[in-house]
Amino acid sequence: MIPVKICGIRRLDDALLSLDEGAWALGFIFHRPSPRFIDPVEAAALLSKIRERSGAEFRAVGVFVDWALDELNAVVREVGLDAAQLHGAEDPGYAASVEAAEVWKAFRVGPDFEASRPDDYPSKMRVLLDGWSPTEAGGTGEVFDWSIARACQETRPVFLAGGIDAGNIAAAIAEVRPFGIDVSSGVESSPGIKDGELIRKLFSEARACSSD
C-alpha cells in the first residue's frame, strides 16, 4: 500500500485506528490557528500512549509554521518526533538547520507556484505539496492542479496533500504516482474531528489501489 500520513492527530483512538489500518505516519500540528492544533506537552503525552498501545512502526511528524528555529528543535526533542514538517516560508538554510531525523518541506501550490521550487531545498528532504489558501497555512481541503505534482515528481518523490479523501485517492494515485498521500480534512466529520468510518474508507481505497 502507498504510504499514507494521517495529519491533525489529537485523540488516541484516532491514532490507533489509523495505525491499525496501515498508516505510515501520523501528523501533529503545532500551528495554533489550526482547528487541529495540539500543544506540544499534550502531544508528547499522546505520542507516548500511542507507542505504548500500538506495536506498529510509524513516523511521528510535527507540523510547524514559521517557528523560531531553536524553539522548533526543542519541541522535536521534547515530544520525541521522528520528523519535522515545515509548512511556512522557511528557507533552505533554515530547513538544513532543523535537528530532526527527517525534515519535510511543504509547499502550498498557488497561482504562482513553480514546479522547480522544491529543487532549491536539499535532496534528502521530503517534499509535500498542498492546496493553497490566502488565509490558511494548510488543512484547507482544496485540491490543486495535479499536473504540477506530476512535474515535481519527475525530479524527487512527492507527498500529495490537498483535499484527498476516499472519493479521489484512487484518481490521485493513478494520475500523480506520488511517493505518498497526506490526509487531514478528508477523514474528518468537522474541522479537527476525525471520523473512524472515513478513516476506514480511505484505507480501504488505498489498499484497493495497491492490489490493482
PLM-predicted stretches and their roles:
Residues 1-212:
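Conserved N-terminal beta1-alpha1 strand-loop-helix module at the mouth
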